[in-house]
């Protein structure tokens, strides 16, 4: 049975966090609730239970639905619910979604069990500066230019959302500068006490091949050496992340409304 969550007590929140731990789908689904709670109309959440045990958790954040479930989940009920609730974008395991959403885009979930296991060397360039949780405009500009379409909102929307999450310690942005010029980005889209979900890994086209991306990733891993680290990538990038110590642990599927 799927139930809408109107609120969460501290104890219920801790139990939900534990349920979502160890999965990029759980981490991404839990992120909006961790950052905003359930008191805003742009964050909604549901859980599925069977015989009293939680088997799935879903969140909807500005129209994007993320699904996290266990092997014991009632998958037919979940898929029926997704059709009913509606979404502008969908994210979950390819195993769960691919037969129902044939036009979705699949990719690889990569993970490090501990940040300290990262084998990235980074750039040896002497004049590099790591700028944490600042320079939002430069971060937005570099990411937008390097990866068109990654950011779906305008700068005002980005600033409002990310600055809120950074203030609450549930996200971080990192901008890399070379000789004072912004050249690369990486973000912790979700940060919990023991896990990171990284994204926004981007380098300006004319600056690629200089190990700037691995420099940013290494900076996060050095800062959080005991955290489990997740990121998602296209299949053609799998080898790059494996070279940095990451291992593929799952396949994801994402769907935009235009692909329905």
Please identify what each model-predicted range represents.
Residues 1-28, 115-157:
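Short amphipathic alpha-helix that is part of the acyltransferase structural core
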Residues 3, 23-88, 183-199:
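Conserved donor-binding loop and adjoining core beta-sheet/short helix segment
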Residues 16-20, 79-83, 97-102, 130, ...:
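Alpha-helix C-terminal capping segments
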Residues 54, 59-126, 251-257:
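Acyl-donor-binding surface of acyltransferase catalytic domains
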Residues 59-61, 150-202:
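A conserved beta-strand-loop-helix scaffold within acyl/acetyltransferase catalytic domains
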Residues 73-81, 203-205, 209-223, 243:
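Conserved acetyl-CoA-binding loop-helix of GNAT-fold acetyltransferases
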Residues 86, 172, 194, 227-228:
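Short coil/turn segments at beta-strand junctions that form active-site/ligand-binding loops
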Residues 92-97, 189, 229-242, 247-248, ...:
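Conserved beta-strand-loop-alpha-helix junction that forms the acyl-donor binding cleft
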